[in-house]
């Protein structure tokens, strides 16, 4: 049976914060945990499903992979076993994890490294840039490791073990039947204290700076695609691992083309004499212009497909087409002489209207039949 969407399992939207994900899982865990539903197989399955969703959506790396590739992006995490790969854990362990994070704590009685936050950057591209690809230099305000203390927060000295929590970074507290962990108020979860803080970073181990990065944009990228730059997010506290930078692509509207998948579409205006008599037109494409032969009696709305003049697919390499939509233009601002010629032409058409304007004649016949049948 196909797995359900993790966001659907927890009942949250795709923009849910980590706190909202935790709250949703806590509600489901209280309802379906096997300790509260002994012998209930349905509750057991629902609990496993909720915990799997929680494990993915509360991990920024797993969540990013899931958002981009679906279940295939995280299947190795669970060894292909699906929800069945999880143990239940007792309620204290589960809520110790959740409450610990809410109050700034961590699991396992060990100090937690405070990994740097992930960053997002919107990159606006022209259609030509998105189709052909390029390298773009961007500037990102962020936190970097302090160069003076190399990220330790302690210039010329070493951090000492926190005397309050003995290096665990956590203090255990009892809340009714639950035993939860709370971040140590002295070391703030690090497990170490700095007696001589670095004056440049005030003991944080990092400083604010604008980084200049080169981003390689692959050909065929489109609005909504993301490029992940691993380790280019904010530096972690006290030398902890950095976060990632996600470059979100947005392609600007183009005056001539609009994109649908790997195909490009373009409206091509045409004067009515060329539409009636045929001819040749020069059609712009993203790779230069091409000559298009227009057959006589071309009607408005006719589509011409130029093979291979679309977009090269980002992953498969297949190339789309350019689809030209013909718009027959009615002449405006006619001179008296031009109007006279058109009137003479119209009189000539009326002599054999069924052959010259079959769609018009068929339409009038349909209208006549509609009213006479009532």
Curated annotation (Swiss-Prot):
- Mark the CXXCXGXG motif repeats by their residue spans: 146-153, 162-169, 184-191, 198-205
Write out the residues that bind Zn(2+) 2.
Answer: 162, 165, 184, 187
Any matching Pfam family? DnaJ_CXXCXGXG
SMART domains in the cross-refs: DnaJ
Q: Which UniProt keywords apply?
A: Chaperone, Cytoplasm, DNA replication, Metal-binding, Repeat, Stress response, Zinc, Zinc-finger
List the CR-type ZnF regions, as residue ranges.
133-210
Q: Name one GO cellular component term.
A: cytoplasm
Q: What is known of its domains?
A: The J domain is necessary and sufficient to stimulate DnaK ATPase activity. Zinc center 1 plays an important role in the autonomous, DnaK-independent chaperone activity of DnaJ. Zinc center 2 is essential for interaction with DnaK and for DnaJ activity.
Role summary? Participates actively in the response to hyperosmotic and heat shock by preventing the aggregation of stress-denatured proteins and by disaggregating proteins, also in an autonomous, DnaK-independent fashion. Unfolded proteins bind initially to DnaJ; upon interaction with the DnaJ-bound protein, DnaK hydrolyzes its bound ATP, resulting in the formation of a stable complex. GrpE releases ADP from DnaK; ATP binding to DnaK triggers the release of the substrate protein, thus completing the reaction cycle.
Record PANTHER family: CHAPERONE PROTEIN DNAJ, DNAJ HOMOLOG 1, MITOCHONDRIAL-RELATED
SUBUNIT field: Homodimer.
Protein name, per record: Chaperone protein DnaJ
Species of provenance: Coxiella burnetii (strain CbuG_Q212)
């Amino acid at each position: 049976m196909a797995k359900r969407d993790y966001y659907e399992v927890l009942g949250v939207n795709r923009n849910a914060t980590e706190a909202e994900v935790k709250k949703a899982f806590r509600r489901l865990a209280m309802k379906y945990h096997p300790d509260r539903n002994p012998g209930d197989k349905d509750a057991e399955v629902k609990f496993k499903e909720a915990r799997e969703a929680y494990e993915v959506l509360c991990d920024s790396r797993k969540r990013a992979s899931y958002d981009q590739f679906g279940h295939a992006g995280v299947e190795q995490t669970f060894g292909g076993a699906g929800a069945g790969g999880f143990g239940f854990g007792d309620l204290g362990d589960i809520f110790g994890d959740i409450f610990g994070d809410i109050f700034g704590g961590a699991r396992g009685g060990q100090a937690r490294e405070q990994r740097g936050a992930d960053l997002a950057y919107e990159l606006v591209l022209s259609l030509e840039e998105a189709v052909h690809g390029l390298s773009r230099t961007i500037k990102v305000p962020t936190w970097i490791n302090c160069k003076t203390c190399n990220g330790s927060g302690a210039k010329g000295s070493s951090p000492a073990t926190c005397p309050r929590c003995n290096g665990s970074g956590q203090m255990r507290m009892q809340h009714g039947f639950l035993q939860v962990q709370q971040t140590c108020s002295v070391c703030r979860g690090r497990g170490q204290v700095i007696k001589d803080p670095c004056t440049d970073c005030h003991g944080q181990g990092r400083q604010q700076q604008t980084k200049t990065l080169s981003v390689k944009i692959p050909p065929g990228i489109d609005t909504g695609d993301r490029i992940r730059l691993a380790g280019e997010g904010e530096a972690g506290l006290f030398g902890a691992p950095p976060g990632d930078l996600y470059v979100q692509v947005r392609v600007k509207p183009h005056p001539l083309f609009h994109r649908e998948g790997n195909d490009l579409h373009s409206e091509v205006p045409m004067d009515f004499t060329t539409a009636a008599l045929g001819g040749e037109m020069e059609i712009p494409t993203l790779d230069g212009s091409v000559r298009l032969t227009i057959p006589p009696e071309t009607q408005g709305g006719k589509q011409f497909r130029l093979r291979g003049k679309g977009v090269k697919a980002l992953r498969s390499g297949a190339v789309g087409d350019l689809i030209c939509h013909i718009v027959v233009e009615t002449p405006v601002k006619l001179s008296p002489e031009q109007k006279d010629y058109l009137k003479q032409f119209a009189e000539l058409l009326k002599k054999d209207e069924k052959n010259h304007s079959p769609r018009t004649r068929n339409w009038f016949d349909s209208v006549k039949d509609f009213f006479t049948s009532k």
